[in-house]
Amino acid sequence: MKYVPEKGCYHGAFPPLYGFDPEDREGSTDQCAVALFEKLVGKQLSMILWYQNMEPGRNFSEMQTVREKYWGKNYQGKYRFFLYGWLPVITTQQMANGELDDFHKSYFAEVAAQKVRDMGPIWFRPANEMNGSWTPYYGDPTNYVKAWRRMYNIAEQLGVTAYNVFVWSPNSVSMPGTEANAMKNYYPGD
């Protein structure tokens, strides 16, 4: 299934409250400052990016709470998509060796159960910017590809991939800019 807009593009953002100057917050204490961002740009968002660490103890219901709060309709009268920036706190070798398998199984089982509510697909963005030296999972393309495929296979076995979207999202520039760390080396395949 493809999620291509009928016309134009999806207007999305990562709108954390800390991105606004204190004088522009209008008294808001909402960590996901969707209303402030929409007021700033003059239109409703089609997609919201929010982050969560990929680690035991974190679960889908935590993200689902954010999703439900901001599920409103966008400017085209359709419900907003949610892009989950999923950040591992371990190395790609640890992920490739299966250290997150139980976490993924539990998480994706929750995701599959939520499909019944039909809030639309979730866009998963796991281990993004893997070609940047600021992440704990950079610098090991071989294990990154193994880890991605391992995670995706678990999602596939639990029926999550047929309805949801998985987004591979490297940084625009590889750092360090070596051939061994080139963006193309991290691509897990179609």
Give the label of every model feature segment:
Residues 1-47, 156-159:
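N-terminal module-boundary/linker segments of secreted carbohydrate-active enzymes
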Residues 5-6, 45, 139, 161-163, ...:
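Alpha-helical structural elements
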Residues 22-41, 59-69, 103-109, 178-188:
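Short, acidic/polar
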Residues 43-55, 84, 88, 182-190:
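Aromatic- and acid-rich polysaccharide-binding/catalytic face
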Residues 51-173:
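Substrate-binding cleft of extracellular glycoside hydrolase catalytic domains
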Residues 164, 168-190:
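Flexible, glycine-rich surface segments
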